[in-house]
């Protein structure tokens, strides 16, 4: 069998949820499990995040899967309903849709659900992505409260720069000033806001990336936040090449040796989810030693520098990210984010669960 695999630790995920809960205080916690739980598998996330107060997903299909798995806790639909036909499913499955544009309100006025829904009413406080304008808050809140198909309302916004130096005040202050007078519960904190800005906690928090052991910040590593990596992508060296000075390796020969050296060929490529654009120098660990990639990443293989790994050879263990090599470090070197790397794990990569919670055994990335 090809040696690449991803090890996923439910124990690490459960630990990271406990970290989130410590920051949340008395607020309730939605575990964000969209995008197949950031590539970790929805069923695995469900077992790991059993202590969450609810789950946040993107689509009706994800929500239905959670209900089929036996989840009876609140499920938040982060983009709400996409057409009037989804209202009935929200009622049947007891889902909490996010309402963020007027057509959704029109649908709820025209088609009363079989049971009144709990909804999250989203306002745009400056990110300019989803949400009603804050200037329209009085009219919008009154309209939603008047809907016979709505049982309870929670106010919501999302931060654009909680993870950088601009912070959240420029969004949080106008959001609170506009909406506090309505006397409704509210939710604003994502992972970055939850860990850095306690004033954003509100009544519900929505941690995502931190639950999977990656840092939401570029200036603080995950270990510095007390987080543990949930996914470790491993493989092995399947060939060793000896390069003379001036010789290149891989497509385009973009790397050329400046002296004689050994290079290892690793069974991992962009078809496995490794970033194709990762340049020479992207960190990798071989037999416990940190080294670097060489040249272009191929579909099924990549090459690594063995200069500092004299004992390495065919069969040597390689960590692409995870235990001993933060996914954030790989993402930074490749000019991307840990979110993208984790979500991009390919279905062809076998997954092995580690830790106490191993009911699913060995499977594949799309399970």
From Swiss-Prot:
The active site is at 34 (proton acceptor), 251 (proton acceptor). GO terms for biological process: D-alanine biosynthetic process. It comes from the Bacteria. The modification N6-(pyridoxal phosphate)lysine is found at residue 34. Pfam families: Ala_racemase_C, Ala_racemase_N. Pathway: Amino-acid biosynthesis; D-alanine biosynthesis; D-alanine from L-alanine: step 1/1. The keyword Isomerase applies. Substrate binds at residues 129, 299. Keywords: Isomerase, Pyridoxal phosphate. One of its GO terms (cellular component) is cytosol. Its EC number is 5.1.1.1. One of its GO terms (molecular function) is pyridoxal phosphate binding. PANTHER family: ALANINE RACEMASE, ALANINE RACEMASE, CATABOLIC-RELATED. This is Alanine racemase. The lineage of its organism: Bacteria, Pseudomonadati, Pseudomonadota, Betaproteobacteria, Nitrosomonadales.
